Regions:
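Bacterial Sec-dependent N-terminal signal peptides
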Residues: 1-24
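Short amphipathic alpha-helical coiled-coil/interface segments
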Residues: 277, 281-284, 461-479, 569
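Substrate-binding groove/exosite segments of carbohydrate-active enzymes
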Residues: 258-393, 420-423, 494-507, 521-522, ...
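Active-site core of glycosidic bond-cleaving carbohydrate-active enzymes
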Residues: 309-324, 329-338, 393, 397-400, ...
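Conserved helix-loop functional segments at active or binding sites
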Residues: 286-290, 342, 346, 381-384, ...
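Terminal accessory carbohydrate-recognition/targeting modules of carbohydrate-active enzymes
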Residues: 2, 22-275, 558, 562, ...
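The feature captures the catalytic groove of carbohydrate-active enzymes
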Residues: 219-246, 302-307, 352-374, 404-469, ...
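Proline-centered turn/helix-capping motifs that create local helix->coil transitions or kinks
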Residues: 288-291, 344-349, 407-417, 477-484, ...
Length: 682
């Protein structure tokens, strides 16, 4: 325990130093609301900065729980919980045809303590008692910890969490008698249900139920506790309900979170980076829904469930699952690519951008967004890093089909054209955009490496390498430009304002315009308090571009600058006003905790900081970027390339670093100059 405290103390000092450096770099000062706890959770001790509101999403295989919570100036909480049931669908099929119901505090059954009504969200009622929230804790389960009674002798832990594998969310009140006399606690028995219209319900009418568990009267002696629960569930068979066991559901949720956190552990001197990495792993991995079409990773955000997108799932998060060590994550990745592959066709019509409603229909409302480049990029990266030849063979036809589709859309200027990009017309993208072309470039590079592993004829793999080289030259010629004085890229042919996606060449290993691009990214024209503006001068931001940029700047070797901005961004997302995960966008969606962005956050470390670039089923190039003020860093329990191994980086004398690879009882240490690449074979 003493060792753990010393480690936490050391990390806190280094984090403080990083904060000071960030302020010197021109980043805004942050006034953190939350603090990291020794068990890896974060806590907010309610202070005088009230009122405050925030929202968070938590997911299981059959449910997603979105909670908006606020604390008023008197310390009382106000909660709104929306429960989404992804596999309970209405007709007609579309992206948002799942059912979801919102429950407010005034719909809860009343709780009494010694015959006095416990007020959760308002201070009315003479002689009644109020639940004053003292702190809120997040770590896969949300806890609101408060006190009630004149001397605060009654403590109440109000926790909310989703079931791991059932269409069920639970709100649990654990009431403890800390006084010297017995108390009597009672909760009203309640069971309310609504049933959807049969004519518009898919498969069967759906029933949503709010019911109590362990209601009634309980006598608590000093030191004793009781748990009272409210359950929110969906069923197509309301007459055949099984009893709900809140304790078992909570235990399962804790175990699932621990299972997600166990592999792929980041160790750096910066406790904020370590903790946000762990939180991002939770959000990226929990948001996988068990559908009739198999496991489907879904973005969430009250809108996107039991559905996959070429960008969110195929491009952003599935390549992360190849490193994650999570079996469900891997299944969701393979299923994602399988579902997209089902839309391949001999006419080379585009694969739809999104497959929705448990795989029953699709959405392609924005036309070709460069989706084939997204899919080929993600699938080839995943196949190499996962390291299983049978899986790669299944993905190869999809990869080659998407590459051929893109080749057929090469323009006279030798760049790939598309109808739009992943922003689907929200901002102009021209006839050919930088993102699609960079993704296609990396896909060609990875496909050449993958094809060699699959013993594809050299004529084909050499052709991919040649096409990649030609495309790289075309990207420089077509997109290379001086914008606002920065030698960087234009996003499309007639673009003359800086765009966030100028980071894409760096993230894909194209470093021709590194200096000017990094200067532009971190200039006041693009960098805002919340990361990169989508376009210079606009308030709109999408975290995905910031996450790509931070990875790309690390890959380009501007390590200390990248770490300053990564520390700033991570602090804001983990400990600031809206926590604890990366978000989708603002103002659209009001910074929803869409889950694939958390996968992108983790990839900043696997591909950026540790510089892992898959080259084969059991090999990778490693170009670690150890910050100048760190002595060491490690990524332990990496599950990739068909192996489990640790990657430990440490500073040596003479500007060199040691790269230690530990696999089982074997280990090998490479000593290289900082910035050099190690070719690792496991």
């Amino acid at each position: 325990m003493k060792f753990l405290k010393n480690c936490i103390f050391l990390c806190s000092i280094i984090s403080a130093c990083c904060t000071a450096q960030a302020q010197q770099a021109g980043l805004a000062k942050q006034n953190n609301r939350w603090a990291i706890q020794p068990n890896g959770s974060i806590a907010w001790k309610t202070d005088n900065r009230l009122p405050h509101t925030d929202h968070i999403e938590m997911s299981g295989e059959k449910v997603s729980l979105w909670v908006k919570y606020g604390i008023d100036t008197s310390g009382l909480a106000n909660l709104t919980r929306t429960v989404v049931f992804p596999t309970f669908r209405m007709l007609p099929d579309d992206t948002r045809s799942h059912i979801a119901y919102t429950f407010h505090d005034n719909e809860l059954p009343r709780i009494y303590i010694n015959n006095q009504l416990l007020h959760l969200s308002s201070e009315d009622g003479t002689g009644d008692i109020n639940l004053k929230v003292k702190s809120i804790n997040q770590h896969g389960i949300m806890h609101l910890l408060g006190q009630a009674g004149r001397q605060g002798t009654i403590s109440i832990d109000r926790s909310l969490f989703p079931s791991v594998d059932k269409p069920l969310a639970i709100e649990k009140f654990t009431i403890t008698n800390n006084g010297s006399e017995q108390i009597i606690v009672s909760m009203e028995k309640s069971s309310r249900m609504v049933t959807t219209d049969s004519a518009n319900s898919k498969s069967a009418p759906h029933t949503v139920i709010m019911k109590t568990v362990n209601d009634g009267r309980h006598v608590l002696q000093p030191g004793q506790s009781v748990a009272l629960s409210v359950c929110y569930l969906a069923t197509d068979h309301p007459g055949m309900l099984s009893p709900v066991n809140p304790l078992a559901e909570e235990t399962a949720r804790k175990q699932r979170v621990a299972e997600i956190l166990a592999p792929l552990q980041l160790q750096t001197p910066d406790s904020i980076l370590n903790t946000e990495f762990a939180f991002a792993k939770i959000r990226a991995t929990e948001s996988i829904f068990k559908t009739k079409a198999g496991y489907m990773h879904g973005p969430g955000g009250l809108s996107y469930y039991a559905a996959i997108w070429a960008n969110d799932q195929a491009e952003y998060v599935s390549p992360y699952f190849a490193f994650s060590g999570d079996s469900i994550g891997v299944l969701s990745a393979m299923n994602c690519y399988r579902l997209f592959a089902s839309y391949m066709n001999p006419q080379y019509k585009p694969i739809p951008s999104s497959i929705v409603a448990e795989g029953d229909t699709y959405w392609n409302g924005a036309g070709d967004r460069g989706d084939q480049a997204m899919i080929a990029y993600g699938a080839s990266r995943f196949a190499l890093a996962y390291g299983k030849i049978d899986s790669a063979r299944k993905l190869w036809p999809l990869i080659t089909w998407c590459l051929e589709y893109s080749r057929r859309h090469i323009s006279q200027e030798d760049v790939v054209t598309s109808d739009a990009d992943e922003l689907e017309g929200r901002f102009p993208a021209g006839k050919a955009n930088l993102s699609t072309n960079c993704l296609y470039y990396d896909a060609l590079t990875s496909a050449a490496l993958l094809g060699k592993q699959l013993q594809i004829p050299a004529k084909i793999t050499d052709g991919y390498r040649k096409e990649a080289a030609e495309l790289k030259a075309a990207i420089e010629k077509y997109f290379g430009a001086t914008i606002d004085g920065y030698q960087t890229y234009r996003y499309y042919e007639t673009n003359n304002t800086l765009r966030a996606w100028i980071c894409m060449p760096l993230a894909m290993g194209i470093f021709d315009r590194t200096e000017g691009t990094i200067q532009a990214l971190f200039s006041p024209k693009l960098w805002t308090a919340d990361g990169l503006a989508t376009e210079a001068g606009k308030e709109t931001f999408w975290d995905r571009s910031t996450l790509y940029a931070l990875r790309g700047v690390l890959q380009a070797g501007a390590t200390d600058k990248a770490i300053d901005y990564l520390h700033y961004y991570s602090t804001r997302r983990l400990l600031g006003e809206h926590v604890p995960y990366p978000v989708e966008a603002y103002p659209e969606g009001n910074q929803r905790h869409l889950s694939a962005e958390s996968g992108l956050y983790c990839r900043i470390f696997t591909e950026g900081l540790f510089g892992i670039r898959p080259t084969g089923f059991n090999s990778f190039d490693c170009t670690p970027r150890l910050p100048s003020n760190w002595n060491n860093m490690a990524l332990n329990k990496i599950n990739a390339f068909g192996k489990v191994f640790d990657l430990r980086i440490s500073k040596q004398t003479g500007g060199k670093i040691a790269v230690k690879v530990i696999q089982g009882g074997k280990q090998h240490t490479y000593v290289i100059k900082s910035g050099d690449t190690v070719k690792v074979v496991l």
